Amino acid sequence: VSDEYRPQVALFDAESGELIHRIVPEESDYNAISYEPGRGDVPEFTKATLPEVYLERRGSRGFEALAYNSDDGLLYAFIQTPMSVGGDSSSSTVRRILAMDPITGEPQHEYMFSQIGPSNQDKIGDAVYDPERGAFLVIDRDNGDTVAANKSILRMDLSDATDTLGYDWEALLGDGVYAPELLENPAAVAEAFAEGDIVEVDQVELLNLPSLPGVDPRFDKPEGLALKPDGTLVVGFDNDFAR
């Protein structure tokens, strides 16, 4: 289970429902809040193994999507929106996908992709792995509730993308520039990626949900995605308990 509010993944026992462990970034600090006994930073079930930079996600914009890749046995966590690296949520359009071993919690791969929709279409909703095509199907949405809204289903192919896990960004971008999110604009990112031979995730928009017959555009938060054995996509909408 991924945590949309922070960069965290929790593994539960399917039969008992008990927490086995949770996976969080290195240097995660829970001391600012007084937790009840058994909560907070409990070493027995906390694996602080993910890259520290993920602590710099925007508030409430953590791992919104999580998908299991049945081909390599890894979990792929998708940051919902561009991170606030350096404390600045600015105009970055760079987002990240982090692959991790669900048992050890160790990160295995990381991939970058830039937003391809309008500026307000900046929220990953959910993702699912398609083993027939070796790619991920991903919801990327805005907050609109009309037929003109953008709630795309994207196909994301990671096969040719550069693995940036552990990448020395300062060597490419300069002293103190430790992440591409710190660059001024998308053009600067594209230039830097070209210089560093960094290939982003290949993205193709398959469809836009509000344009489909029978889809009520007032359901503005598609945040669940599943793939049936026959290839049918099932989309779930979150209404935040609205009635």
Each predicted region: which residue ranges?
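Sequence/structural signature of beta-propeller domains
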Residues: 1-243
